[in-house]
Amino acid sequence: MATYYIGANDEHGQNPFTAGKRTPVMPYLNVPFYENQFNRPTKIKFLEACLRNNFAVYDVKPELTDTSVSTRVTRINRQNLTLLVTFGYNAFGSGTTFNSAQGISTFYSQRNVRPAQSRALAEDVYEQLLQGTNQQGRGVSSLTDVGVLQSVNCVSVLLEPGYMTNFNEAKLMVDPDFQTEVAEETCRGVCLYLGQSYVPRNNTGNYPTLRNGSNGNFVYLLQYILTQNGYNIVVDGSFGANTLNAVTAFQTANGLTADGIVGANTWRTLLVLPPRPTVRQGDRGVYVRYLQQKLTSKLYPLGSADGIFGNGTRQAVVAFQQENNLSADGIVGPLTWDAVSTVGGGRTQ
């Protein structure tokens, strides 16, 4: 199999948040969502999907700060990438109020060194996004004066799968499952463009058992996910002592057998896949953080998504249960998981 080198770029930043690149103030939460709260995690999930599909990957902007287009173009043009995907989110109007503009767009530049190939990639990604999400389509368009499209030395596309100024699509920005949908469908589009079969995310049978001494793309993927969970390890594709320690710590923190071996149960937990465990006040871990992210996307205030099921999270769960005709006991079992894990929905304006 040919080795393809895939770059991923996210627009704007979150340390600090890029001024103006945000939704109107969200009701119930009384804060806006910022564009990079969608762009960055979706980029990361796309890179993870590419690793699973045996691509080499390059993160154009690993830092949280906004980075100039010229700096990013310079980085990109040093890499000899097969292609580049940039993640953004659209807006319409003044940005202070919500409106009806909605839907998915993908973009390319006719000034790119490979305009026909860039358009073909934009069309393939667009097709997969339409099939794999519930978003309406706005089409594939050419843009000028966008440096990451026209000034790079590789095939390049930009995708914007929604509008920050549309109330329902604003909520989707911070929905982890919508982020995953966009990332995975974008990877499907890349696979389609490259003529390669796509390896699905949610089947743990696609993930090999890893242990100390393992090497390769799935070790890169493991290390990448661990770093996103706060473990300070080098992402080098080699399962050594530091990766072993991080795996053991992750297993301990999430109620798994702490043997340092990454089998089906550990992969399922790393990916936060169902069946999801019953959680309640006092619990911790990745499933609690996922719950908190889902509640936030549905506009139930709880504080930060820190993976700790405290009183604020319990109050949000009870409110969600009351408003969705569930037993309001503050315990997240199968029925509450089914309701909260839907993509989109939540409180209305």
Task: Label each residue range with its predicted role.
Residues 28-37, 60-65, 108-115, 169-176, ...:
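Second-shell loop/turn segments in exported
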Residues 196-235, 253, 268-307, 346-349:
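Acidic, Ser/Thr/Pro/Gly-enriched interdomain connector segments
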Residues 1-73, 100-102:
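Active-site histidine-acidic residue metal-binding/catalytic motifs
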Residues 2-7, 15-16, 78-79, 84-93, ...:
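Active-site-adjacent mobile loop/cap segments within catalytic or ligand-binding domains
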Residues 3-8, 56-61, 82-87, 105-108, ...:
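Structural recognition of the beta-strand scaffold that forms the well-ordered cores
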Residues 114-141:
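Active-site-adjacent substrate-binding region
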